[in-house]
């Protein structure tokens, strides 16, 4: 469908990947890599840009280093919110329990709760902030309900603008997230982070940062790219223990 629109609009140069009955709709094309051998997504689309400049297929460097600026107004807004609840910036761990895609990208809430408890027990000055959209608020409440010392953990899911979420992540000591948009924000901000993968492929959508630690079990059934576990066990996420994630966090310091 996406290839049909530029054809109907009489756009002269229509670049894309072959397949899906696109013959004639695109006039500059590449073979679509198989799902079992996909390059990182950024490289996947940069290859089309390269094709426009080098239709003869010259291979050029497509390595990228994403960067993101923090809005001064958002930074001030978040600082004010943190001061209101007496949270010091140097002690913030941001945990992002959500993933819009579905449960096969979400590390279990009980694991997030256990990790939060470990951080609080091991670091008395630690403050945990749960971050996400409005749809993640219930996940945040589930996590908090399983944690003692709830004065050190707050649910900000659905309570920030996108700019404020970016600013908060930029202030964090460590970011722990699923494979989600907030993970990529953390990577672009070069924040120390742990990225947890389940049904998706960290080779295809990795956090592009040298400060990121990826945890992926690489089970025979993974990546399945399904919204629900076809086998009904969700071992790709459930078998990632909180202690494993805690160990990854400790290597970031």
Identify the residue ranges that each predicted region occupies.
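Catalytic machinery of carbohydrate-active enzymes
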Residues: 1-253
